[in-house]
C-alpha cells in the first residue's frame, strides 16, 4: 500500500529561495556537450522539461580543462561555455524552475587524451585509480596520475573561484561543489587515495583542507545560502577511507561553520548498497544546521517516509528524472513511471535524452 506522499509536495526554504516541492534532480553526467565542451541547445530542452523539480542540479561541469575526466562533459571556464549555459538557465527560468550548477574537478579519474597537452591527470598522490572513464571508443581505464605539487593548489582554488563567478554570469541560481564520488576533493579527503606528507595530507584536518578551502573560494562570489556541497562517505571510483565516520563528522562540522545552504549526501554506495559503509547519516544531518538532501536509490514511498519522519529536508532522484521529465506530477498522481534506457545514458543526441514521454503523451 502506498504511503501518504503529501510531504513530497510541501514548499521548502533554501536560503532565500523557495522551492515548491521537496524533489531535487540529482546531477547526472550525460556526455552530450558540443565542441569546446559547451552545452548544446538540446541540453536547454532537457533541463527545461524537468523544471517542475523543486531544484535542478546540473550535470558536473569542469572548472578547468585539467578538471575534465570524461568525453563531452560541459565546462564552466570559457566565455563560450558561459554563453551556452545561459541558454540552459534561461530555458529553466522560463519554465518556472530553479537550477544550480555542479562544479567539478575529477582529479585522477581522467585520461591523458582529455588533459591539456596530453599530460597526466592530477591527484593528491601518484596512485592510479582502478576505475574507468568514457572516451570516443567507449569506456577505458583511467591514466596514471601525478601528484599535485603544493605550488599548484592556489591555482586550483582560483579555478573554483572563477567557475563560481562564471556560474553567476551564466544565470544559475546557485552552485553545488562536487566533493563526492572519488573525484579530486574526495580523493584528498580519503586516506586510501591521499598519501601526502604536507599540509594537505596525513591528519583528517589536513586531508579535509582542500575541500574547505574550495568552499571558501566560491563563498567569495556567492551568498552562503546559494551554495551546497555533495559528499559520499562510501568507496566510489576506487577512493575509500579507513574511518569515514570520523572524517565526515569533521568535514560536516567545518562546513556547518561556513553556513552552507545544504549538504547533498550519497547514503551508501552510489547506485548500490545503502549500508556499504558504517556511517551515521542521521548524526551527520543533525550536526549540520543547513538543509540536508538525501540521495541513493530512493523510491516515492521511501522519500515520503524520510521527509515525514524528519530524517531529511529534500530527496534527490537521478535515473527517475532521466526517464520521467514530469516526475513531480507522476509522484503526485502515483502514476506509472517510464523505465530509463541505460544504453543512452552516456553520449548521443535526443534519443534517451529529450524524447521520454510525459503523462499527457503516453500511449
Residue ranges and their predicted role:
Residues 1-363:
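Flavin-dependent oxidoreductase catalytic cores
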Amino acid at each position: 500500500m502506498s504511503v501518504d506522499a503529501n510531504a513530497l509536495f510541501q514548499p521548502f526554504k533554501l536560503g532565500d529561495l523557495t522551492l515548491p516541492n521537496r524533489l531535487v534532480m540529482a546531477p547526472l553526467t550525460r556526455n552530450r556537450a558540443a565542441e569546446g565542451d559547451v552545452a548544446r541547445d538540446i541540453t536547454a530542452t532537457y533541463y527545461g522539461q524537468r523544471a517542475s523539480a523543486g531544484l535542478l542540479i546540473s550535470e558536473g561541469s569542469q572548472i578547468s580543462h585539467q578538471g575534465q575526466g570524461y568525453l563531452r562533459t560541459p565546462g564552466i571556464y570559457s566565455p563560450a561555455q558561459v554563453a551556452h549555459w545561459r541558454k540552459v538557465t534561461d530555458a529553466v527560468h522560463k519554465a518556472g524552475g530553479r537550477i544550480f550548477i555542479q562544479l567539478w574537478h575529477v582529479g585522477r579519474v581522467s585520461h591523458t587524451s582529455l588533459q591539456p597537452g596530453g599530460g597526466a591527470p592530477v591527484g593528491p598522490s601518484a596512485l592510479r585509480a582502478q576505475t574507468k572513464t568514457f572516451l570516443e571508443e567507449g569506456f577505458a581505464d583511467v591514466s596514471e596520475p601525478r601528484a599535485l605539487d603544493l605550488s599548484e593548489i592556489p591555482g586550483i582554488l582560483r579555478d573554483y573561484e572563477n567557475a563560481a563567478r562564471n556560474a553567476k554570469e551564466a544565470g544559475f541560481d546557485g552552485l553545488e561543489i562536487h566533493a563526492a564520488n572519488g573525484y579530486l576533493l574526495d580523493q584528498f579527503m580519503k586516506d586510501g587515495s591521499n598519501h601526502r606528507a604536507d599540509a594537505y595530507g596525513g591528519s583528517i584536518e589536513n586531508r579535509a583542507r582542500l575541500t574547505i578551502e574550495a568552499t571558501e573560494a566560491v563563498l567569495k562570489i556567492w551568498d552562503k545560502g546559494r551554495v551546497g556541497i555533495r559528499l559520499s562517505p562510501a568507496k566510489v571510483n576506487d577512493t575509500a577511507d579507513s574511518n569515514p565516520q570520523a572524517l565526515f563528522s569533521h568535514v560536516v562540522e567545518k562546513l556547518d561553520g561556513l553556513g552552507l545552504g545544504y549538504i547533498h549526501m550519497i547514503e551508501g554506495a552510489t547506485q548500490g548498497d545503502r549500508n556499504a559503509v558504517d556511517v551515521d547519516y542521521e548524526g551527520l544531518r543533525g550536526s549540520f544546521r543547513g538543509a540536508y538532501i538525501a540521495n541513493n536509490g530512493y523510491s516515492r514511498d521511501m522519500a515520503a517516509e524520510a521527509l515525514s519522519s524528519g530524517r531529511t529536508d529534500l530527496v534527490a532522484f537521478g535515473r527517475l528524472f532521466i526517464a520521467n521529465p514530469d516526475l513531480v506530477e507522476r509522484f503526485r498522481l502515483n502514476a506509472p513511471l517510464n523505465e530509463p534506457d541505460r544504453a543512452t545514458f552516456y553520449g548521443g543526441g535526443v534519443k534517451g535524452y529529450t524524447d521520454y514521454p510525459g503523462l499527457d503523451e503516453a500511449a
